[in-house]
Amino acid sequence: MILRKKIELFVLPEFTEIQFEGFHRFIKYGLVKELNDFPKIEDTDQEFEFQLFSRQYQLAEPPIEERDAIYQSITYSSDLYVPAQLTERKKGRVKKQIVFLGSIPLMNSQGTFVVNGVARVIINQILRSPGIYYNSELDRNGIPIYTGTIISDWGRRLKLEIDGKTRIWARISKKRKVSILVLLLAMGLDIEEILGNVCYPKLLLGCMKRKTKKEHLQSTEDAIVELYKQIYCIGGDLNFSESISKELQKKFFQQRCELGKIGRLNLNKKLNLDVPENENFLLPQDLLAAVDYLIKIRFGIGVPDDIDHLKNRRVRSVTDLLQDQLKLALNRLENSIRQAIRGANRREHLPTPKSLVTSTPLITTFKEFFGSHPLSQFLDQTNPLTEVVHKRRLSSLGPGGLTRRTASFQVRDIHPSHYGRICPIETSEGMNAGLVASLAIHAKVDNWGSLESPFYKISGVSEEEDMTFLSAGEDENYHIATGNCLALNQTNQEEQVTPARYRQEFVATAWNQINLRSIFPLQYFSIGTSLIPFLEHNDANRALMGFNMQRQAVPLSKPEKCIVGTGLESQTALDSGSVIVATEGGRISYTDGRRITLLTKEKEVETKLVIYQRSNNSTCIHEKPRIQLREYVKKGQILADGRATAGGELALGKNILVAYMPWEGYNFEDAILISERLIHEDIYTSIHIERYEIEARVTSQGPERITREIPHLDNYLLRHLDESGLVLPGSWVETGDVLVGKLTPQETEESLRAPEGKLLQAIFGIQVVTAKETCLKVPLGGRGRVIDIKWIYQEKTSTTYAEIVHVYILQKREIQVGDKVAGRHGNKGIISKILPRQDMPYLQDGTPVDMVLSPLGVPSRMNVGQIFECLLGLAGDFLQKHYRVTPFDERYEREASRKLVFSELHEASRQTANPWLFESDNPGKSGLLDGRTGDIFEEPVTIGKAYMLKLIHQVDDKIHARSSGPYALVTQQPLRGKSRRGGQRVGEMEVWALEGFGAAYTLEEMLTIKSDHIQARFEVLRAIVTGELIPKPETAPESFRLLVRELRSLALNLDHIIVSEKELRIKFKDI
């Protein structure tokens, strides 16, 4: 194969570029535009005039650094200052001041926003582009209905339709519609103009004939009145007035007919109009052209639109979302200033610009947006890959978008226009499948919100190949060769037949017909999917699971890079911000665990390292230096590794020696058997940091106090507290230990009920105020080492005084039975048993296997990539090599992956003199010995080095047992859930199981005493303490009494009657 001589080489883009570019556009253009649009404000008497000089705005530098904002739990933001002028026209006085409009949260170097000390990310939304879309559908009777939907920039819609009787309507709502003639006349057109600009004017004439003389519309005024009556459902006679016209303009035309720049471009292109781009509203001629096109489609001229095509969608990035919020905030500010000017007019003193402008609208609007908007999300910080993927996410949900329940399968499905723009594999599992997607590696968003993908142009004249970016609508008319086919030999390329894409179809065509070719085999996939080696050998569903589980991988205390990868690991780690890189060349003058100092030619650069910091997902963020003192480094060289990185590469898991074989049923149903070596050598040990919070407020009875003096509790529980009542850093705390001592004053009435309180008040007249303890204690499963205590917030105002204390506890978790582990190919399982090393199956050189996987998990799941990976990993382990294999290597030759694996295994066998590594009779398999008996297993077994991940689904977070705890007030049954110390109900099927075994007494206990029999509970406790027999309950349980009460509330009386056998007397007894 001979490659072309001159090719413009591609480089991988920065993975978080979409976030930085979006925020840059907001600061540079969006902010200026919205400030420029702020109007001059006058009072009703036109005595005062207020205006902002938006071009001279200033954004102040943030007063603190990003890291300090996280530590102090405040927002990393910049203050916005704008010069303002207030003019008093009567006296000719002018006051100019620089006013503070508010704070705008700033994007940090990671591409996220720090709001109240928490990292948040703004998701890019993908939704219908404003414009017009035509469609045809069948009604209930099977008659085709042709529709044209005009989507405004606000997301509101105006629907035109031709029904089965060829009448044309404009639909106002689901139930109401108005004749198109009424709407066109109301917009200012006359009948002659309407009929002269549509094909088949008979259709519109037919609409006119159906109207009686009384209903016939003579003028625009009549049409406006008719439209107003239809929209507001008003009957009877109504006369035209200017107020009706203004109301219609405001409520109907302005909301449904504002197209925006993108909508105007789309409409001009679709309907072949020549309207200026700055005309953002729907004009009468636009609607007339839309009706004309709809009539043409009815008669077979023109093609309906594909709603799901990406050319009909646009991406709302950070720019648009923040600009919308700024617009809303400035509207609120405008209303506030108008009210302030009105108030100042009534008073005598002259206001100043500073007294009129308040920062509240801007601050509260952005606070609401970042706190509660569905597209502003809590950054997923489980590992570095998760952060990068979260920033590149595309969501169809949110305001103006789709909803989980109403979205159809068609919307969720993969579309041919997604190729190279949206990853066909990466999406959520469950309700959000297909609605939340991810950008492909090389995709980017242009200024109009369209997704673009790069291609090489192929020219017959020149040998050069230039790169060009095309959107989804632009590449339809080209033959595009796929990225996983090689450039062909120059001599016979014209004779070669190449697979290509053309007009949303896959075709085979001659090379001389090809116009463009893809630049990279992984161009179609997202970052997470591209990290799966031998991706082409996996079923897409398992690849999806493999990616989703990489996002859930917990950073380990000793990271290890994979033997078999795809080559994208280093850039993923770099773009996530987890590794620290030298910004300039120089010499390391100082390094320790907390900082690195680099001496360059001009200056000394100090970099602070992050030490044991908690992430949003309670995993540990920790950076370790990789360089030595006095070492010379180049620009771009790695100075420090972060969590889940090793040598500057992403390292989410460990290379583990695995065997695919059954072992005594312990790997039934995907369960996994592991060696105790993984525990003793801390191979799967991870560090987790939990944060516990307590707040001391001023209550109506007095202030809450943080103190060490807690008389209610045993001194043993308070042993770790210092003099001020806070736990000492470095203390090892167990469940129930007090972290922060706090006393809350009780109400006086409650204090009076205590006998000693009454006595003291009667004798000495002392009012006794008692306090109850509301200490912060270590919850169940929260044991660990206290690493930090923060007084986060201390604010004194006229009404409140609050103190917030955060306590951070570090836990070191080893792998254990019940933890979930997974590979990169969707092969997941739960640890079922931990075996001693000597009992594990071992190789012919005596090495015990670390993990035993079920072989039945491979054929039915069709994820054969894991076998290629583990065999190549085994060869790499013996040869001391690392492999970076780009997926789709079959483009070189058939069976390329298999040939690579077997050749490397053969080479490893030859170099290490281990013939069992590659046996020609059973390639890829080897004889394995039983660790318990020393006998060889009957069948050869597939063994290899697989890269296995420990996932965040850990048994410590999930397992829960209850001996006693709280009960629900109504049913008197135990509460539900681990957080409430609840229990589990015995349901119908569990009762059947106990009945089947005849466990009558156990069943009775579960349904009464252990569940909801209040009286029996106390009797059982007394019987256990005194050693008596447990009495049989005589009364009904609470759930039965509840049922009776509910029946009584429905006027159905249910009584308990006892009939005496001797006297035959009836005795009523309350249930």
Curated annotation (Swiss-Prot):
UniProt record, GO biological process: DNA-templated transcription
Broad class of enzyme this protein falls into: transferase
Record's subcellular location: Plastid, Chloroplast
Repressor is among the record's keywords: no
Similarity comment: Belongs to the RNA polymerase beta chain family.
Tagged with keyword Kinase: no
Catalytic activity field: RNA(n) + a ribonucleoside 5'-triphosphate = RNA(n+1) + diphosphate
Keywords recorded for this protein, A-Z: Chloroplast, DNA-directed RNA polymerase, Nucleotidyltransferase, Plastid, Transcription, Transferase
Gene name for this UniProt entry: rpoB
Enzyme Commission designation: 2.7.7.6
Source organism: Anthoceros angustus
Protein name per its UniProtKB record: DNA-directed RNA polymerase subunit beta
A GO MF label: DNA-directed RNA polymerase activity
HAMAP family: RNApol_bact_RpoB (MF_01321)
Record's GO cellular component terms: chloroplast; DNA-directed RNA polymerase complex; mitochondrion
Record's subunit section: In plastids the minimal PEP RNA polymerase catalytic core is composed of four subunits: alpha, beta, beta', and beta''. When a (nuclear-encoded) sigma factor is associated with the core the holoenzyme is formed, which can initiate transcription.
Annotated PROSITE patterns: RNA_POL_BETA
Protein's job: DNA-dependent RNA polymerase catalyzes the transcription of DNA into RNA using the four ribonucleoside triphosphates as substrates.
